[in-house]
Amino acid sequence: LSKFKVVYIAPMKALVAEITGNLSNRLKTLGITVKELTGDVHLSKSQIEETQIIISTPEKWDIITRKTGERLFVEKVKLIIIDEIHLLSDSRGPVLESIIARTIRQVETSQLPTRLVGLSATLPNYKDVGAVLRTKKEGLFYFDQSYRPIPLEQRYVGVTEKKGVRKMLMIN
């Protein structure tokens, strides 16, 4: 189990803590260790070595991958999951782009494969994100509302009222 690592990148510390707790509970019976790595939670080299899944914020993972002293650790990473990848178009997008570009460059120079997976519940431009991740067509999966266990009904209502109070009453 210590031959490779999985990194799960979540956009907020609260989400990192939640995912760490959920995965720890589900995977502990399999002997898989899950740890949080954020600006508030630091891991020693030995803790990192004995951890199989690291849940991190984009900013912390960006810092780790920039350090040349962490190269051996980074080379053990075989899977990077980026949750909420639609944030590429957000103010934090450049950090995610940097992580993706650095990972792709590392794969090209070391010839050690690392899989990049992007997750989002709201991603209308999934083909563009697939291009950023350099995903082949057969490796790009998009699940529309037809895959939902409970059908999703959408309704659009137009409000033409211009006056604030009346407009709010109509919207509510």
Locate predicted features.
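Conserved catalytic network of the ASCE P-loop NTPase/AAA+ motor domain
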Residues: 1-2, 26-30, 45-49, 70-75, ...
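Flexible beta-alpha connector loops of hexameric P-loop NTPases
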Residues: 13-14, 71, 86-93, 117, ...
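Conserved nucleotide-binding/hydrolysis micro-motifs of P-loop NTPases
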Residues: 13-16, 41-43, 59-62, 86-88, ...
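SF2 helicase catalytic motif II
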Residues: 54, 58-62, 68-111
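Conserved nucleic-acid-binding Ia/Ib motif block in the N-terminal RecA-like helicase ATPase lobe
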Residues: 4-63, 131
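Alpha-helical scaffold elements adjacent to nucleotide-binding pockets in ATP/GTP-utilizing enzyme cores
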Residues: 18-26, 60, 76, 95-103, ...
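Conserved interdomain linker/interface between the two RecA-like ATPase lobes of SF2 helicase motors
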Residues: 101, 114-172
